[in-house]
Amino acid sequence: MVPVSFAFDFCGEEFRLTADRALYWPREQALLVADLHLEKASFFARHGQLLPPYDSRETLERLALAIRETGARRIYTLGDNFHDSAGTERLEPHAAGMLAALTRAVDWVWLTGNHDAQMEARAGGTLAEELEIAGIVLRHRALKSETRPELSGHYHPRLQLTVHHRRIRRPCAVVSKDGHGCGRMILPAFGALTGGMDAGDPAILSALQPATAIDAVLPASGRLVQFPLWRAAA
């Protein structure tokens, strides 16, 4: 299945948000994904909560597809890559082989998050706490009062909607705007086994201040749609 994507402007740059929760940056030939949480199921299994042990394989298969279909030559993961520091040691052989092949095929950078305090580059690629590319900061968690354009993860935002009297939840990006036609963005979690926080939660809205507007953005009905979450007082 081709991961359909939708173009939009962010701080003067074209980005494409895929229906499968990845963000492609055409000018940089870069694919950005947040919160993979690889080996989350095996972490819970070690603590007595048995879950199907296929989350890492599913996440990596989806990521490989996104790389093929976008033609990305660089990957930036925005933190919380493995669910815990021992996750790389628990990868089953097939998933480990997939990850090794991916990190050899593209220029791969792991940005580290709160789950990655002791992460080592044993899975391939390189490690960084944050980067700035073309004036846009990439980091795991939005830095409150950051004045530069920023792409981050951490919060796993999801939009809650009521459709035909049914409540549904969909992963989304959350995008803020400042008074200069730019802003910051929190990406949805890409991992197969990740929960989510309501996109309008005060923790998310506070993290993106200062702002003049904050919207949830997600693909729906074959297009990219925006739902207002917060507006500055007139």
Predicted regions and their residues:
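Extended recognition/assembly regions associated with phosphoester-bond processing machinery
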Residues: 1-234
